[in-house]
Curated annotation (Swiss-Prot):
Pfam families from the UniProt entry: HGTP_anticodon, tRNA-synt_His
Phylogenetic classification of the source organism: Bacteria, Bacillati, Cyanobacteriota, Cyanophyceae, Synechococcales
Family per record: Belongs to the class-II aminoacyl-tRNA synthetase family.
Subcellular location: Cytoplasm
Record-given protein name: Histidine--tRNA ligase
EC number assigned by the record: 6.1.1.21
Protein encoded by which gene: hisS
PROSITE patterns, alphabetized: AA_TRNA_LIGASE_II
Amino acid sequence: MEMIQAVRGTRDILPQEVRLWQQVEASAREILGRANYQEIRTPILELTELFARSIGSATDVVGKEMYSFSTRGEQEVSLRPENTAGVVRAYIQHGLQVAGDVQRLWYCGPMFRYERPQAGRQRQFHQLGVELLGSRDPRADAEVIALAWDLLRAVGAENLTLRLNSLGDPQDRRAYRQALVDYLTPLKEELDLDSQERLVRNPLRILDSKDPHTRTIAEQGPKLPDYLSADSRAFFEQVQAHLQALDIPYELDPYLVRGLDYYTHTAFEIVSPELGSQSTVCGGGRYDGLVEELGGPPTPAVGWAIGLERLVLLLQKKQQEIPPTSVEVYVISRGAKAEAQSLQIAQALRQAGFCTELDLSGSAFSKQFKRASRSGATWAVALGDAEAAAGEVQLKHLPTGQQQTLLQADLVKYLVSQR
C-alpha cells in the first residue's frame, strides 16, 4: 500500500527540532512577560471578510494566497494568513479597548498561505507576534522594535539588520501612490508581469519586486519619504531618536512598504543575509486605522511578527542544537509480577520529579541494560519476579557500574538524597 505523506507545503517538526522551537518560545515568554505583554489565543478559522477588510482585497494575500471555503451554513471562512487582524477582531469583540488603557498582547501559532514552497516559506507556517494597541506615542514603536531585537539576539541570531521606513498617514500614501502610478504607467511594458498586474491593484508592492530590472526602474522613480507631511516626518524622526537612545542600529530603506494594506507610518523588517531570498525574519509596523476599519473606535496600534520557520532555519545554520531532556532513571523489569510493579515504580519516580523511562520491551535484562546505557540515564532500576516478591529493586549507577539492593519503599527517598 502506498505511503501517505504530508501535504505539499507542510512539514513535520520532529522531536530534535522541536527542542529548538521550545527554546525560542520560552525566551519569548520570558522577554515579553518582562514587558507585561499578555498572551492571546485566537481561532485559526476566521470569516473571510475580516481579511478582505484588513489586509486589503487587492493584496496578493487575499487575492491569491488564502485558503477559503464555504461552511454548511454558507459562511465564507478562511484559514488565517496572519494574526494581526484576528487579534484586533478579538480586541473589539471582547471590549478590551478600555478608555486610556494600552493593551500589550502576544501570540504564537500556525498561519496558512498558498505559496510556492521553498526553504523558509511553507504553506503552513508559524508566527510569533506582538500587538501594542492604544498608543500613538513613538516610544511604542521603539518598544516593540526593541523587544523583537532583544528576542532575536537572546536566542542566538546574529548578523541582523533592522530596515526602517515611514509610510506616512493615508493622505501621504495616496499622494505617493499617485506619483508612483504616474511614473510607472509609461514604463509598464518594461516591468515584470507581476508588477504590471500590481500597477493596477496595489502599486506600492512593485517596490518589493524581486525582479532586478523592475527594482532598477522603481528606484529611479519617486521616493516615499519625499511625500511625507511635516507631522509624519516629525513622528518618524522621534522613532529614530528613541532607537538611537536604545543603541539599536538601523538602516533607512525608502522602498520598504510591507505587503499588507493596513500599515501606516512606521514600517520595519529585521533581515539576515544568511537566509538568501527569504531574508526577512521579523516584519511589522504601525496600523493606526485598522481597529476603526474593523468596527472599533479609532485606536492607534503597532506590532510585528517573527517567522519561526525562518528563525529556526537561521539558528540551524549556526549548527545550534538543544540537547535532549536527559533521562535520569531507566526502569527495567522481567517477569509478569515485576512488569506490573515496574509501572508503579516509574510513576512514583515521575511524581517525585525524576525524568523516568520505562522499558516496555520485555526482552532479556542484558538488552534492557544496553538500552538504559544508550538513553543517557544515571540510574537503572531493575527487578525480576524475585525482587517483586521481596518488595525490592536492584539499583545500578550506570556511570560507575556500582549496584545495590534497595527496598522499593526506600527507592525514591534514596534517589532524592543522591541528587
